[in-house]
C-alpha cells in the first residue's frame, strides 16, 4: 500500500503530532508499505533525518490555544500539494489535523485517494471550527474515515462536525522508554526526585507544581524538582520562584530524545499538572513505561489514560494544595510508589506503536473495502 502522511507542523520541531506521524510511518514501512511524509520545515531536508520526507512550505509561529503552532500559511503551497498528490497517486492519504491550514486543508480539498483524518487537539472552545463551519463542513465530507486520539478530542470536533470518529489512541515507543537504562548518577544522592516534562507554557501548569513544591520543601528538605522542556517561564512561575526562594529546582531545558528515558528512570515521582488543552497524556505513558509513578491533573485528556489509584494519581487542576498532599503521600510511602510504577508499566504495554499502527491499518483496510467492494472479494 502507498500511504501519504500529511502534517501541518514544522518537521524540524519535534512535537506530539509529528512524533505520532513518524512512528506510524516507521511501523507501516516495517509491514512492507510505502510511506511519504509531507510537512513544512524550517530546516533543509538533509538536516532532518527523515528519508521519506517531502517538505512543502516554510512554517511561521502562530499563537494557538495557549501554545505556539509552527505552520505554513502560504496559500500558494496548495498548488504544490495538489501536484504531489496527482504525481504520487497514494492509496491512502492520512491527514493529521485535517482542518488546519495550509497543507492539511489542501490535501483534503485535492486528494482523490482514500482520505483519513486524525484529530489530535482538545480545545474546549474552537473559534476556528465554529467560524469556518459553513465552509469546512463541505470539505470534511472528503474524509472517508475519521480518527480521534481520545474521546475528549472526538467530542470537541464532533460538536461542530457530527459523525463517527474511530478512537485510536496515541502510541508509545516501549522499546525506547522501557529500556533498562541507568538513572543519572549525579541525582542518585538520596534525594527524592520529582520530574516535570513539558513546554514552558501556562497551560502545562508548572506554576502549580512550583507552588506545591514550596509547600512541601520545608517538611521534606530531601526533595528535588527537575524540570525538562523548552521555552521561557510564564510570569506566575517566575513570581513563585522569586518570592519563595525555592532550593533544589533545576531547569534542564530541552534534552535529547535519547536521554528522556534516563530522566524518567531518575525520577521517583513524575508530575504533570496541566490545566487543560490536552487531548491525551503521552508524557504520562512515557513515565509509566519507564516504571515511574505518576501524579497528574484530573483533566479529560489525562483521565482517558489514567484511572485514579490504579495506574497513577489524579488531582484537581489548578489546586496546588491538593497536588502537595498527593506528593506528600507518595514521598512518605515508597511501597505506593513501587506498586504504582509496576502497575503503570504493565498498563503502558497496551499502547505500543505496533498495536496502534495495526489498528490504523485495519481501519484503512475496512474503509478501502467499503469504498471498493471488489477489494473485499479479492481478499476473500
Predicted feature residues:
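Carbohydrate-associated surface elements
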Residues: 41, 152, 171
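Short alpha-helical donor nucleotide-sugar binding micro-motif in glycosyltransferases
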Residues: 254-255, 262-267
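Acidic donor-binding loop of glycosyltransferase active sites
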Residues: 265-279, 292
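N-terminal strand-loop element at the rim of the active site
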Residues: 7-12, 26-75
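Nucleotide-activated donor-binding/catalytic signature segment of Leloir-type glycosyltransferases, i.e.
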Residues: 237-255
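Conserved acidic donor-binding segment of nucleotide-sugar-dependent glycosyltransferases
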Residues: 308-309, 313-320, 329-334
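Conserved donor-binding/catalytic core segment of Leloir-type glycosyltransferases
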Residues: 186-214, 226
